[in-house]
C-alpha cells in the first residue's frame, strides 16, 4: 500500500507540473492526492502505525484489545490532527496577511505607488517598480504583492511587449523579495513554523543572494528596453462610497498593518505561540481601526470598485487550498516512511546538500516552489531526527540543525529556482493569466537570466558557508 500511495502522489506531482498543458488546476490535484493518500493510509493503518509508532500505539491502547476501529481512532486523534494543525497554521497566516492587504488596498493605502512610478524613462521605471515590489514582497507576501503590482503596471504601460517584460521583472523581484524573510513567502513561513530556522538568521543569510537574484536579471532586462516609453497614469479610483480617509489616516493604517507584520517574529519569540496568532492579532487591530475611521460610511462592507481582477483574487483562495493539500500529501509520505528511506539513500549515495539544492531548484522550476520546498524539507524534518541518527559525520549532521544551512538552501532554491520557468511559481501563473505570456517566450527572454541569477546566489551562499 505504501507503494500505491507514493505512486499516486508522484502522478499528482507530474499532473501539477504539466498543468499548463493539461489545464488541470494545481489546487484540485494537490487536495486530491493529499486526501486520497490519507484515506488509503487509514484503511491500512495497522501496518503503518506498528511500523512508525508501536510504542505510542500500545501505550494509547492501555491494555485494551487492538482492532481496526481502535487504530483508526489513534490515527485520527494522534497523527492526522497533528499534521492538519501544522497545515492550518500556515493557511491561517496566509489568510490573515492577505486580508490585511485587502483592507489596506480598499482604503487606498497603496495609492501612493502609481504616482512615484510615473516616469517616461523605461529603465528608471523598471528599477523603480521592481524595487517597490521587492520591498513590499519582503514585508507582505510574494503572491499578493505580485498581483497588486501587476495590476498597477498593467494600467500604466499600454505597450503589450513592454508589459510582458515588466511583468516578468515584477515576478522575479516578488519571488526574490519574498524569499528574503520568513513572512514573505509560504515556503519560508512553513519552515519557520516548523521550528527549523529563526527569522533573523534566515534573513541575514539570504540577504545578498536574494538581492543578486533580483539585480542580475533586472540589469540584463534593462538593456532590451527603449530609452523612453508611453506612460499612462491610472485615474485614482472613485472612493465616494469606499473610504473618506485623509492621507494621515491612510499612513496610520499602513503603519498598523505593515508594522504589525514586522512585529510578528518578535511576538513569536516572546510568546512561543504560532505566528498565525500574531497575524490574526494584527488583522483584528487593523480591522478595528478600519471600523473607527470609516464609521460615518453607510454599507462600509460594500466597496464601489474592486482594485484587483477577480481571476487573481480567486487565485489567492486557490493558493490556500493548494498549501493545505501539499502539506497533507508530504505528511502522509512521512508517515509511511518514504522520506526516511529517501533520506538514508541520500546520506549514503549523495551526501551533499549542494547537490540537493541544485535538484531542488530545477524541480521547483517545473513543479511549484511551495510543493518542492515542502517535499525536500520534509525529507529531514522529522520530530525525532531518526533519519540522521546513523550519520556519524558531526559536520554533516549540523547542516540539518535549527538554522542549519540545508533549510536555507531549500528555501532559496525552491523560491528562486521557480523563476527559471514561469510555471514554477504562483506569481508566474498570475502573470501568465494577466498578460497571456507563453512559457516558450519566457524561457527565451527571461528563463536563462533567472537560471544564471539563481546559480550566482547559490555561489554566494557557498562562499558564506566557507567563511562562517
Where on the chain are the PLM-derived regions?
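Structural signature of hydrophobic alpha-helical transmembrane segments
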Residues: 1-8, 85-96, 138-146, 176, ...
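Juxtamembrane and boundary regions of transmembrane helices in multi-pass small-molecule transporters
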Residues: 4, 23, 161-164, 168, ...
Amino acid at each position: 500500500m505504501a507503494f500505491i500511495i507514493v505512486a499516486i502522489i508522484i502522478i499528482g506531482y507530474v499532473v501539477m507540473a504539466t498543468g499548463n498543458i493539461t489545464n488541470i488546476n494545481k489546487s484540485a490535484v494537490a487536495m486530491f492526492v493529499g486526501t486520497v493518500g490519507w484515506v488509503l493510509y487509514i484503511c491500512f493503518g495497522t501496518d503503518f502505525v506498528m511500523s512508525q509508532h508501536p510504542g505510542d500505539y500500545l501505550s494509547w491502547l492501555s491494555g485494551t484489545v487492538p482492532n481496526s476501529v481502535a487504530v483508526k481512532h489513534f490515527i485520527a486523534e494522534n497523527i492526522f490532527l497533528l499534521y492538519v494543525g501544522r497545515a492550518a497554521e500556515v493557511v491561517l497566516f496566509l489568510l490573515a496577511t492577505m486580508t490585511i492587504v485587502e483592507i489596506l488596498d480598499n482604503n487606498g493605502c497603496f495609492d501612493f505607488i502609481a504616482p512615484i512610478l510615473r516616469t517616461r524613462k523605461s529603465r528608471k521605471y523598471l528599477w523603480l517598480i521592481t524595487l517597490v515590489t521587492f520591498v513590499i514582497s519582503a514585508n507582505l507576501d510574494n503572491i499578493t504583492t505580485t498581483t497588486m503590482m501587476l495590476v498597477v503596471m498593467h494600467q500604466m504601460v499600454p505597450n503589450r511587449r513592454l508589459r510582458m517584460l515588466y511583468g516578468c521583472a515584477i515576478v522575479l523581484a516578488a519571488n526574490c523579495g519574498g524569499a528574503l524573510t520568513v513572512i514573505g513567502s509560504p515556503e519560508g513561513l512553513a519552515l519557520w513554523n516548523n521550528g527549523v530556522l529563526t527569522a533573523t538568521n534566515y534573513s541575514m543569510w539570504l540577504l545578498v543572494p536574494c538581492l543578486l537574484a533580483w539585480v542580475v536579471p533586472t540589469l540584463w532586462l534593462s538593456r532590451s528596453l527603449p530609452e523612453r516609453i508611453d506612460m499612462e497614469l491610472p485615474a485614482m479610483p472613485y472612493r465616494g462610497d469606499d473610504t473618506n480617509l485623509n492621507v494621515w489616516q491612510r499612513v496610520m493604517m499602513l503603519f498598523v498593518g505593515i508594522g504589525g507584520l514586522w512585529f510578528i517574529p518578535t511576538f513569536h519569540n516572546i510568546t512561543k505561540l504560532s505566528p498565525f496568532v500574531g497575524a490574526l492579532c494584527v488583522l483584528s487591530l487593523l480591522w478595528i481601526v478600519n471600523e473607527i475611521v470609516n464609521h460615518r460610511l453607510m454599507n462600509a462592507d460594500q466597496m464601489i470598485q474592486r482594485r484587483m481582477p477577480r481571476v487573481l483574487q480567486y487565485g489567492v483562495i486557490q493558493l490556500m487550498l493548494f498549501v493545505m493539500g501539499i502539506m497533507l500529501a508530504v505528511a502522509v509520505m512521512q508517515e509511511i516512511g518514504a522520506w526516511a528511506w529517501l533520506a538514508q539513500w541520500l546520506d549514503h549515495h549523495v551526501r551533499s546538500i549542494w547537490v540537493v539544492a541544485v535538484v531542488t531548484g530545477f524541480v521547483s522550476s517545473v513543479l511549484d516552489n511551495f510543493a518542492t520546498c515542502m517535499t525536500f524539507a520534509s525529507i529531514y524534518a522529522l520530530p525525532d531526527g531518526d533519519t540522521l541518527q546513523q550519520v556519524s559525520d558531526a559536520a554533516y549532521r549540523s547542516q540539518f540543525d535549527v538554522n542549519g544551512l540545508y533549510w536555507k538552501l531549500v528555501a532559496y532554491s525552491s523560491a528562486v529556482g521557480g523563476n527559471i520557468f514561469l510555471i514554477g511559481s504562483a506569481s508566474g501563473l498570475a502573470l501568465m493569466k494577466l498578460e497571456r505570456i507563453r512559457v516558450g517566450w519566457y524561457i527565451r527572454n527571461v528563463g536563462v537570466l533567472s537560471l544564471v541569477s539563481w546559480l550566482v546566489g547559490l555561489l554566494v551562499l557557498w562562499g558564506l558557508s566557507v567563511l562562517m
